[in-house]
Amino acid sequence: MTSSQFDCQYCTSSLIGKKYVLKDDNLYCISCYDRIFSNYCEQCKEPIESDSKDLCYKNRHWHEGCFRCNKCHHSLVEKPFVAKDDRLLCTDCYSNECSSKCFHCKRTIMPGSRKMEFKGNYWHETCFVCEHCRQPIGTKPLISKESGNYCVPCFEKEFAHYCNFCKKVITSGGITFRDQIWHKECFLCSGCRKELYEEAFMSKDDFPFCLDCYNHLYAKKCAACTKPITGLRGAKFICFQDRQWHSECFNCGKCSVSLVGEGFLTHNMEILCRKCGSGADTDA
């Protein structure tokens, strides 16, 4: 190799007795090599010279001293890290920034650890406990109240009402009647035993009855049509001498004119208007 062949490929200065870099079978002095081929650091934007360590991740480059967590600035050299939105984060900062927070203790639920989810919130498994007995609930059935979450045994002991019919716990809903509580499916007509949930009903001696049973067993009967007089929804009726009539049935026994609000006479248990009763031997 001649002396001219031992010159820098770019500036042609002699490399004899100097440091140089061989690239693609060409020789370069250190200054030219750094100026032409060095990568630029993502952090400080300065060239990463040949005498510095070049750390590369996904075609991005850093000086060794610049390769740090974007949040806490601790070195990431030879340490695990996560890239998020073009930022490099150590695992601790990533967990604090991106992982779920425990609804109870407000601390980070670390990636890979077991977490419990309920109503859109997250808990550490050890924090998801019954408000009363403080035992972990895990995947067991639970009942939630404003004061917290409860395992079923503790909820029944502390809060539950018991059905007046079957004597079992009412966990939700229920019907209150005469200061007693029933399951919806246990609140039945005392006559025919059909469910009264979402049905109109009447009571007799503190027992509930559907309208059909109550009317059949207890309602007064119209002296004209003999059908029950229920009095529901504001229905009007007429009462006279221990007899009752639907208002639409209170008519003259002969001409059938309505006697509601009119004077009338009686004859042999018959109700007559004044005109029809004037020729009969009536009771005043």
From Swiss-Prot:
Single GO BP term: positive regulation of transcription by RNA polymerase II
SMART domains (alphabetical): LIM
Compartments reported by the entry: Nucleus
One protein family per Pfam: LIM_FHL2-3_N
Main location: nucleus
Tissue: Testis-specific, temporal expression is coordinated with CREM.
Keywords from the UniProt entry: LIM domain, Metal-binding, Nucleus, Repeat, Zinc, Zinc-finger
Tagged with keyword Metal-binding: yes
Disulfide bonds: none
Gene3D superfamilies: Cysteine Rich Protein
One cellular-component annotation, GO: nucleus
InterPro entries in alphabetical order: FHL5_LIM2, LIM_FHL1/2/3/5_N, Znf_LIM
A GO MF term: transcription coactivator activity
PANTHER family assigned: FOUR AND A HALF LIM DOMAINS PROTEIN, FOUR AND A HALF LIM DOMAINS PROTEIN 5
Function: May be involved in the regulation of spermatogenesis. Stimulates CREM transcriptional activity in a phosphorylation-independent manner.
Quaternary structure and partners: Interacts with CREM (via the third LIM domain). Interacts (via second LIM domain) with SPAG8.
Protein name, entry field: Four and a half LIM domains protein 5
Natural source organism: Mus musculus (Mouse)
